[in-house]
UniProtKB/Swiss-Prot annotation:
<comment type="similarity">
    <text>Belongs to the universal ribosomal protein uL29 family.</text>
</comment>
<dbReference type="GO" id="GO:0006412">
    <property type="term" value="P:translation"/>
</dbReference>
<dbReference type="Pfam" id="PF00831">
    <property type="entry name" value="Ribosomal_L29"/>
</dbReference>
<dbReference type="InterPro" id="IPR036049">
    <property type="entry name" value="Ribosomal_uL29_sf"/>
</dbReference>
<keyword id="KW-0687">Ribonucleoprotein</keyword>
<dbReference type="GO" id="GO:1990904">
    <property type="term" value="C:ribonucleoprotein complex"/>
</dbReference>
<dbReference type="InterPro" id="IPR018254">
    <property type="entry name" value="Ribosomal_uL29_CS"/>
</dbReference>
<dbReference type="GO" id="GO:0003735">
    <property type="term" value="F:structural constituent of ribosome"/>
</dbReference>
<keyword id="KW-0689">Ribosomal protein</keyword>
<dbReference type="InterPro" id="IPR001854">
    <property type="entry name" value="Ribosomal_uL29"/>
</dbReference>
<dbReference type="GO" id="GO:0005840">
    <property type="term" value="C:ribosome"/>
</dbReference>
<protein>
    <recommendedName>
        <fullName>Large ribosomal subunit protein uL29</fullName>
    </recommendedName>
</protein>
Length: 66
């Protein structure tokens, strides 16, 4: 996800996306621990970075409301 796409979202949409990505990350990590080979091992890193991006922009929006 690009930061510009995230900035267009409202706080509720950002929260939903964070939850969705965290569930997907847990699923991918579970597959990895069970020994299943991942189709694309970069998925875990990308998910973590997307979550961090979402949290950062969420925090920016909350601070700007003050």
């Amino acid at each position: 996800m690009k930061p510009s796409e995230i900035r267009e979202m409202n706080l509720e949409e950002i929260e939903k996306k964070i939850i969705e990505l965290r569930l997907e990350l847990a699923k991918e990590r579970g597959m990895l621990t069970m020994g299943t080979s991942l189709e694309n091992p970069m998925v875990i890193r990308d998910l973590r970075r997307d979550i961090a991006r979402l949290l950062t922009i969420k925090k920016e929006k909350l601070r700007s409301k003050r």
